[in-house]
Swiss-Prot record:
Coiled coil: none annotated. PANTHER family: UPF0145 PROTEIN SCO3412, UPF0145 PROTEIN YBJQ. This is UPF0145 protein Bcep1808_3406. It comes from Burkholderia vietnamiensis (strain G4 / LMG 22486) (Burkholderia cepacia (strain R1808)). Disulfide bonds: none annotated. Belongs to the UPF0145 family.
Amino acid sequence: MTDLSRSADTLTPARVTTAFDLPGHTTVRSLGVAQGIIVRSRSIVGSFGAALQTIFGGNITLYTSLCEKAREQAFEKMLADARKLGANAIVAMRYDSTEIGSGVTEVICYGTAVCVTPDA
């Protein structure tokens, strides 16, 4: 017997998928959209360092690091939002980003918060 109200504690990154269902599980309840939003800006030092990296071409590691951190933070906020809803899984997870202003970017991570039970 599974207590769905207590199973929200089992929401881990392994129970987040971009698919519309979680393999090996049955969705028993949809709880709505879970989301995490983070707005990041580049520092003057970071912008200068990245500008220097563009001269040589290739991966701009300063921006890559900033983007990775923003995505991680948005993901963690989405998990926290899903836990508040009582979810133990998230399906149809997506990322999106928008430049709000010069050097200011919004990153959103969202998906459908659900309660699942393992298939028999």
